Amino acid sequence: MSPSAAVLIPLAAAVLLRPVVGQTQCGGNLYTPGTLNFTLECYNAFQDCVAQFEANASQVDCNDGKGNLFMQQQANLGASPGSQNNDAIIAFQDIRDLCLLSGSTTATWGYSDNQWYWAAAEDACYTNDPTRTDVVKTHPAPFCIQNRDSSLPECYPQPDATPPGGPLKVIKTAKTRNGFKSSARGWNTYGVQALVNGSQVVPSFAGQSGLFYTQKFVETQCGVLARPEFKKAGYDLCSLDSGWQATTAVDQHGRIIYNTTRFNLPELASWLHKRDLKLGVYITPGVPCLAHNQTILGTNIKIKDVLNGNNDQINCDFDFRKDGVQQWHDSVVAQWASWGVDMLKLDFLTPGSPSNGANLACDSSDAVRAYQKAIKKSGRKIRLDISWKLCRNETWLPIWSDLAESMRTDQDLDNYGTNTLMAWQVGQRAIENYRQYIGLQAQRNVPLTIYPDMDALFTVNPEHLAGVNDTIRYTVQNHWLGAGANLIIGGDMEQVDALGLKLTTSKQSIDAADFFAKYPMQPRNPGTGSNAAKQLQAWIGGPSDDHEAYVLIVNYGPDLGNGGFSTKLYGKQKVTVSLKDLGISGSAWTFTDIWSGKSSRVTGSYSAWLTEGESQLLRLKRTH
């Protein structure tokens, strides 16, 4: 057994107890991995110090006694004895594998529970003597170490600027990889899970928090989806976010199973299907680390023989070059299909998932491919949603478009640390990310085969829970409709008010959703028709072959930090967009506000006075 493997085995068990989301920072002198080796003397001293630190949270310093290796820990001595330095092992594994053995000579590791670790290796710990055998080989870092604040700019380029007055290229959507012709509609647990104390504001969540929610809560919420008004509007997906899985057990073949204390997924799926609803579940790449000794179904292969490290998110990563990996995915999806699962959300994918604070594989697209193949083999029609804020440059947008039904275009919309669902500042950011996404899709000049996932739709609850006023609730709904995005409600289905019902289940909402599923909207700036981010903005979806279109005009209000437009116009503003701006001049059109029902005939331009955060969604029909 190699020195590195000797530490990885107990680490797997440690990580299973809770997800460790530390941040490693490499520094010091740089070297090219493979050109130097790490001396076994320094390696053993490193391991000895780790053991000392683990045994004594009060110990601060440790070194090799020769001036070549120095290490420190700052434990959280105010915590309970078992939690003061419980990150020490995983922290020093990261310091060792991601930095000292991978191109850097110093490293720090920090985590939000007030634990901090550091190590530095001097030149004497490294050798370029090829004849020495008392060494540990250096290697490229097995993970992409992302700074918590990294925006991964190479992943999210701005779309090419469209020329003022340029022709309109209608964007169309074709069938997805698995044959779906619209984005998903339904409800998801996470909006309530993310509330700082959801049990205070969502009665059916009483006694629950975060990842610890129950099947009874899900049935209470999704029972509302079974009502005729939601069923008619197509809101049929009941989606479980993280928390349904067992974290301390797998089945005999190492497959992910449900937490039997709080769930019975086959029973839940049956309950939903009897009501014409569908079941969705949340997953992340990899396999639970405690499954390492299990044998993959239909093979003689142990899971531990096809792994490629630990990604700090409870799971261990697969080496997709090895036989057995696809068979594991096939067996997992086959079991979920037998339970009645209709949708998979695959989260923490890369390239993407920026600022995650974890050690993720640089490219986990093979996990998407493996699940896609497994879905096809299962014979069940299952949606695949991939997440989050995935790389959308010219390399990756075509790849994701060929693998899944929908892709997350931004980070979470949730208003963390509060008991409200969202804040308008984050809403502006989500809309700006969609603007970039659709502009990049338009440049490809091909029908879209994937839908945007803009995160949960927080429009059905009144302001005290939604976190935004009714004016902005309209605007959020208008944008999610216009994008052809997943319409997955977040929040409390038992507190849907009259406006929430109108926004999601009215005929005008259904008609708009069906239209935008085929013709997603794109920006056409008032006055120029360009696609830049503007506070006073216009969008158009279509026109269709039947000479129908939708136009959205909006005043986003002052840029709250992530709107992309930087201006700060306050109060009501006049928004005027011409048919030329929209790219549909030469004909007369009837503009009808879908929510108020007011209509006007337009031959030149259309104007409206809109306050901060206000918008109008207009249905257009050509009159000649």
UniProtKB/Swiss-Prot annotation:
One term of GO molecular function: alpha-galactosidase activity
First-tier enzyme category under EC: hydrolase
Annotated gene: agl3
Entry function: Alpha-galactosidase involved in the degradation of simple oligosaccharides like melibiose, raffinose and stachyose, and of polymeric galacto(gluco)mannans.
Record's protein name: Alpha-galactosidase 3
PANTHER family linked to this entry: ALPHA-GALACTOSIDASE 2, ALPHA-GALACTOSIDASE/ALPHA-N-ACETYLGALACTOSAMINIDASE
Species this protein is from: Hypocrea jecorina (Trichoderma reesei)
Catalytic center residues: D347, D412
GO cellular component: extracellular region
